[in-house]
């Protein structure tokens, strides 16, 4: 069984990051002049990362023994054609491009799991004959999924397609450490400016969820829920040590929306 995580972007020439803004994504396009295009290209290489859940999904599927790839190149027809199931991250910044590719894949009878909070907000845009919109945190969905062809195919049938279960991961320690080593060999994994400290920058989450009242307009509670869930300090430290040994970097970017909400936890970490 082969899975392809197909991460669609309208351009590689300026910074587009789907993980920011609570999974909606953000981008910087400084203009069309020669200078602006140079800045666009530079920034796109200096600040670059995928949606974290995409690499969690990759790692979960890999550990379960499946053939899985992460790909941004739509010209890689071989990977697309050979995939039994395609997993497509969604975002506001690449919405039009994602939907266009989704429609094309559905017409070719490819089965597509659409992941990410934005597809749950704009369901009608991502709803196709051969698509299933995964609600909640997709890591929970793929961690607990029954991997038989019969069960997987059932998600693309009418009745099951309308199910809307919660997939929030209560025990964050149950998640594997994302395989950033695989990703960084194919694409930039950076978070620096003006070339300072250009080591690989590992995104990491010590907690998920945000309880504050700004949930009325903020995207993070949509993505992670309002309940704050903490990993154990040991689990976070073990991931840091794992990445330092596997990737020879000591640069980490904590992506928690409320990293310091629990002072005791933060100080211990």
Where are these regions (language model features)?
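Glycine-rich beta-alpha loop elements in corrinoid/cobalamin-binding modules
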Residues: 53-171
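Aromatic- and Gly/Pro-rich amphipathic surface segment
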Residues: 26-55
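Short, glycine/serine-rich, charged loops/turns that create anion-binding
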Residues: 10-12, 119, 209, 258-259
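Short, solvent-exposed beta-strand-terminating loops
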Residues: 3-29
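Radical SAM [4Fe-4S] cluster-binding motif and immediate context
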Residues: 177-269
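N-terminal [4Fe-4S]-dependent radical SAM core
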Residues: 15-16, 151-203
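Short hydrophobic segments within beta-strands
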Residues: 6-8, 88-89, 115, 255
């Amino acid at each position: 069984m082969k899975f392809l995580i197909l991460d669609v972007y309208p351009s590689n020439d300026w910074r587009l990051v789907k993980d920011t803004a609570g999974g909606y994504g953000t981008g910087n396009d400084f203009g069309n002049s020669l200078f602006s295009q140079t800045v666009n290209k530079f920034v796109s290489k200096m600040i670059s990362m995928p949606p974290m859940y995409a690499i969690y999904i990759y790692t979960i599927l890999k550990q379960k023994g499946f053939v899985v790839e992460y790909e941004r190149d739509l010209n890689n027809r071989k990977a697309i054609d050979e995939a039994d199931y395609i997993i497509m991250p969604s975002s506001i910044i690449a919405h039009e491009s994602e939907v266009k590719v989704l429609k094309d894949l559905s017409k070719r009878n490819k089965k597509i799991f659409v992941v990410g909070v934005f597809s749950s907000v704009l369901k009608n845009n991502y709803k196709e004959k051969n698509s299933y919109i995964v609600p909640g945190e997709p890591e929970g969905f793929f961690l607990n999924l029954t991997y038989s062809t019969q069960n997987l195919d059932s998600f693309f049938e009418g009745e099951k397609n309308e199910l809307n279960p919660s997939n929030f991961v209560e025990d964050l320690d149950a998640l594997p450490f994302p395989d950033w080593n695989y990703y960084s060999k194919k694409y930039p994994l950076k978070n620096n400016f003006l070339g300072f400290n250009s080591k690989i920058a590992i995104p990491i989450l010590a907690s998920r969820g945000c309880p504050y009242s700004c949930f009325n307009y903020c995207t993070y509670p949509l993505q992670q829920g309002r309940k704050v869930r903490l990993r154990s300090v040991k689990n976070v430290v073990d991931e840091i040590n794992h990445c330092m040994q596997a990737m020879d970097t000591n640069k980490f970017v904590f992506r928690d929306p409320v990293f310091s909400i629990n002072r005791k936890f933060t100080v211990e970490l």
